[in-house]
Amino acid sequence: MLEVGTIWGFTSTTMASIMFLWPMYKQFVPYQLREYLENTIQKYLDKLFRRDSNFVYIRFPEYTGEGLSKSRAYDEIGNYLSSISTARAKRLKAKESENSKSLVLCLDDDEAVVVVFQGVNVVWSSTVVDKEDKHNSKEGRYLTLTFENHHRDIITNTYIDHVLREGKEIALKNRERKLYTNNDSSSYSSWWEGLWSNVPFNHHASFETLGMDLDKKEEIKKDLIKFTKGKDYYRKVAKPWKRGYLLFGPPGTGKSTMISAIANFLEYDVYDLELTTVKDNAELKKLMLDTKGKSIVVIEDIDCSLELTEHRKKKKEEDEDKEEKKEAENLKRVSGNNESNVTLSGLLNAIDGLWSACSDEKIIIFTTNFVDNLDPALIRRGRMDYHIEMSYCRFEAFKVLAKNYLENESHDLYGEIGRLLEEVDVSPADVAENLMPKSDEDDADICFRRLVKSLEEEKKKKIEKEARKNKKKAEDNVKQEKQNKVKGMVTK
């Protein structure tokens, strides 16, 4: 009878060889033949390894909870394996990292690596279920830990904790913040392609460079810091550890820049949720569940994303009075599956219902140009806890922009610019455009004079607009007086 050590050495060599040949095997061998061979090999392996219960297998799937959420353990184990695979694995997968000068190498799919922990040999293998295997499609990717049964205590009580701890430390060291966007539900046919796509988050906005009143910026920063330290407090008051921010104001006032500044200040990932591509309420719930903690979920221009406004509520009442609700639903069915069926109640439940407590330390931000158009239920305190008005550019915000764009903190034109900014409404984006040098010859003086000229033109337009408005009002008054006289004569 073979000794356990002999079997173990044979197993390690065999698994490494199989993982090396596996991609070619899947590519060139027909599926029906593969299925037969795999069943035969499985029977052999069962007899070889499981007959005396010498080996234990622990599987760590990529997704947990019936595929609803990403497994943290899977990610942490992946980080751990990436640190040891470079020198040991035959096949590696290369990934770019913004925080590293070189490529990050990790264990490739369908590959195995042998690890020694306190004198104990274990095998880690990475597996991807064949997409043609419909019965196991929910397995997706998974990592398997194999070890001898008599080492069960040290593996389950010590080694796994060691792996997860190492994985967390590596993640913090090499953390690269991401900007996510949800995939169009009509563009992917299989769940393993993922609900979210991501790119590195490289926006460099900060509160220091944000064109806004200094006191207001400090107030927002203090609120954010208080939130990040509020884990115990939120648990004490029995509330999910999340906070909602509503950014509202005219176009160009810096709402998107504010989001980037918040993300950089907290070092959070950003999930840009495009509601119009979400199929229905169930898919919206899955998207929210698939977001991680220490993140910001953003819905920009929410008044334009879906019909979630007060106008929709009034229209619905009119439709019910005219008994047109059924007809509208029929038309919706005919329009096909590409139209989003997300409802206001579905959105409210996703951000503030029972499922919202499934992940901690999360900020939800809505932006809108027209806050009065939004349904009051959507922006009430408790959902959108902090309302931040992004207003037109005034003198304090101008000074921040002048320092950022021109490295200038004083000029003879500051007084005139401050006076004009109080008289006209211009966005920080418009001011920044005038302050930005257009050529190498443009110095601070040229840029400030260009801004003054632009502000004077805006003031002229404002005066002309008010004059036209007053003229029309006077004409309307004269017209109304004539109508009243005629009406009085007819009455007599």
Curated annotation (Swiss-Prot):
- Residues the entry annotates as binding ATP: 249-256
UniProt subcellular location: Membrane
Q: Provide GO CC annotations from the record.
A: membrane; mitochondrion; plasmodesma
Q: Which SUPFAM superfamilies match?
A: P-loop containing nucleoside triphosphate hydrolases
In this record, what's one Pfam family?
AAA_assoc
| Sequence ranges of Basic and acidic residues compositional bias | 323-332, 462-484
InterPro entries per record? AAA+_ATPase (IPR003593), AAA_N_dom (IPR025753), ATPase_AAA_core (IPR003959), Mitochondrial_chaperone_BCS1 (IPR050747), P-loop_NTPase (IPR027417)
List the disulfide bonds in this chain. Answer: none
In terms of superkingdom, the source organism counts as Eukaryota
Membrane-crossing ranges are 7-25
**Which reaction is the catalytic activity of this chain?**
ATP + H2O = ADP + phosphate + H(+)
- Membrane topology classification: Single-pass membrane protein
Cite a single GO BP annotation.
response to stress
Swiss-Prot/TrEMBL cofactor(s)? Mg(2+)
As for family, the record states: Belongs to the AAA ATPase family. BCS1 subfamily.
Name assigned to this protein: AAA-ATPase At3g28520
